[in-house]
A protein has these predicted regions:
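Eukaryotic alpha-helical solenoid repeat scaffolds
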Residues: 307-310, 315-316, 326-334, 345
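N-terminal cationic leader/targeting segments used for protein routing and processing
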Residues: 6, 210, 214, 240, ...
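Helix-turn-helix repeat elements of alpha-solenoid scaffolds
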Residues: 15-22, 34, 49-63, 90-105, ...
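N-terminal leader/linker segments that initiate helical-solenoid repeat arrays
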Residues: 2-42, 71-75
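Amphipathic alpha-helical repeat scaffolds of TPR domains
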Residues: 36-46, 57, 71-88, 116-133, ...
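Flexible helix-coil transition and linker loops at the boundaries of alpha-helical arrays
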Residues: 63-74, 105-119, 151-165, 199-220, ...
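A generic structural signal for ordered secondary structure
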Residues: 78, 99-100, 105, 119, ...
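Intrinsically disordered, low-complexity regions enriched in serine, threonine, proline
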Residues: 1, 9-10, 24, 37-39, ...
Length: 345
C-alpha cells in the first residue's frame, strides 16, 4: 500500500536524480578537449543508464500503480501528489510521467470528488506543461486547459484560497497568450479573448477582493503588450486586421513614448518595443516599406557599433540585444525586403 510518506520520498528522490542528470550534462559541456570529452561521454552513458534503471524502479513502485488503476487514489494521497507536483513546478522541474500524467489523473479525481480547488490547480499545471511542449496538438491542449479555468470564473468569488484564485486570474492572462504563441485563433477571436480578460481584471468585485494582492493595472499593461505586440511581431500584414493594428499602435505607442521619456535616444530602448512599434506603423501604412527597413537597419547598426558582446550588465547573452539582432532582427529585415519587394525602393 502506497502511503503519503512514500509519495513524498519518491518526489524527493526523483528530484535528486533529475539534479544529478543535469549536473552530468553540465560537466560534459565543460570538457577541456576531445579526449576528456569522450571520457566524460562514456561516464555519462554509464551513469545515465543506472539512473534510468533507478527512476524506472521508483516509477513502477509509486506512480504507475495509480496510472494503471491497480492502486486507487484517496483524498489524502491526491492532495499529497498535488502538493509535491506544485512544489516541483515551482522549483523548475519538468517530467512527463511523474508530473503531467499524474496531474491528468488527479484532474479526473478532483473533478469526480468535486474538489474545485484541486481541479483548478490541475488545469493550471496542465496548461503550463503543454504550453512548454513542442508536440503536435500541445498548443490546443494548453489553450483548452486554460479556457476551462476561465469558464469557471464564477467560482472565483466563492473560493477562499488565494493560491487557487490566482490560478483563475492568471488563466485569463495565459489563455490569450497561448493563443498567440501557437497562432490558434483569428484576430477577431483573439481580441474577444483579450477583452474577456480585460473585463475580468476591471471588474470592481475582483479588484475589491484581490486588489491588495495583485497589481491589476500592471497585469493589463503586460497582457496588452504580450498579445498585441507579439502577434504583430510574428504576423504578415495580410493576416492582421485594421482593428487589431489600431489597438496595437495605441499600446505600443504608449510604451514607445514612455521609453523616450526615460532616454531621448530612441535606439537605446528595448528592441522588442522599438521594432514592434515600427512594424505596426508599417502595417498601418503610416510608414513606408523603405523607411521601415532603413530605420530598422539603423537601429541594428547602432547596437552592433555600441554594444560589444557581453556589454549588457546583468543580462544573459541570449537575452542581449546583440544576440536578438543576430537571431531575429537581421532575418526579419531580409524577410521584409523579399516579401514586400514591390514596396522597397
Amino acid at each position: 500500500m502506497v502511503s503519503r510518506k512514500d509519495i513524498e520520498d519518491f518526489y524527493k528522490k526523483y528530484k535528486k536524480n533529475l539534479d544529478a542528470e543535469a549536473q552530468v550534462i553540465d560537466r560534459l559541456l565543460q570538457a577541456e578537449d576531445q579526449e576528456i570529452w569522450l571520457e566524460k561521454l562514456r561516464k555519462k552513458a554509464r551513469f545515465m543508464r543506472n539512473l534510468y534503471i533507478e527512476n524506472e524502479a521508483l516509477l513502477n513502485l509509486y506512480v504507475r500503480p495509480f496510472l494503471s488503476g491497480e492502486v486507487l487514489l484517496n483524498d489524502e494521497l491526491a492532495d499529497c501528489f498535488l502538493h509535491e507536483i506544485i512544489d516541483c513546478r515551482a522549483e523548475g522541474y519538468e517530467d512527463d510521467l511523474a508530473f503531467r500524467e499524474v496531474t491528468e489523473l488527479l484532474n479526473g479525481y478532483f473533478r469526480e470528488t468535486k474538489n474545485r480547488g484541486g481541479e483548478i490547480w490541475c488545469l493550471n499545471i496542465l496548461g503550463g506543461l503543454y504550453n512548454a511542449g513542442s508536440g503536435e496538438g500541445d498548443g490546443e491542449r494548453s489553450k483548452a486547459y486554460f479556457q476551462q479555468i476561465v469558464e469557471r470564473k464564477d467560482l472565483y468569488f466563492e473560493i477562499e484560497d488565494l493560491g487557487v484564485r490566482k490560478r483563475i486570474i492568471y488563466a485569463f492572462y495565459n489563455h490569450p497568450v497561448v493563443s498567440v504563441n501557437f497562432r490558434q485563433v483569428s484576430c477577431e477571436e483573439l481580441l474577444r479573448i483579450l477583452d474577456e480578460a480585460m473585463d475580468f481584471y476591471n471588474d470592481p468585485r475582483v479588484r475589491e477582493k484581490d486588489g491588495e494582492n495583485l497589481d491589476f493595472d500592471e497585469l493589463i499593461d503586460e497582457l496588452n503588450y504580450d498579445v498585441l505586440g507579439n502577434y504583430i511581431c510574428g504576423s504578415d500584414r495580410a493576416d492582421v486586421t485594421d482593428e487589431f493594428l489600431i489597438r496595437g499602435e495605441k499600446v505600443l505607442g504608449a510604451l514607445y513614448e514612455a521609453e523616450l521619456k526615460k532616454n531621448p535616444n530612441r535606439f537605446e530602448m528595448p528592441d522588442e518595443i522599438y521594432c514592434n512599434y515600427h512594424r505596426c506603423l508599417f502595417f498601418l501604412g503610416k510608414m513606408s516599406c523603405t523607411d521601415f527597413v532603413e530605420d530598422y537597419w539603423a537601429f541594428c547598426s547602432y547596437i552592433l557599433e555600441n554594444e560589444p558582446l557581453g556589454s549588457q550588465k546583468g543580462v544573459e547573452f541570449y537575452d542581449s540585444r546583440v544576440f536578438q539582432i543576430a537571431t531575429v532582427h537581421l532575418t526579419n529585415i531580409l524577410y521584409v525586403i523579399v516579401h514586400y519587394n514591390n514596396e522597397y525602393h
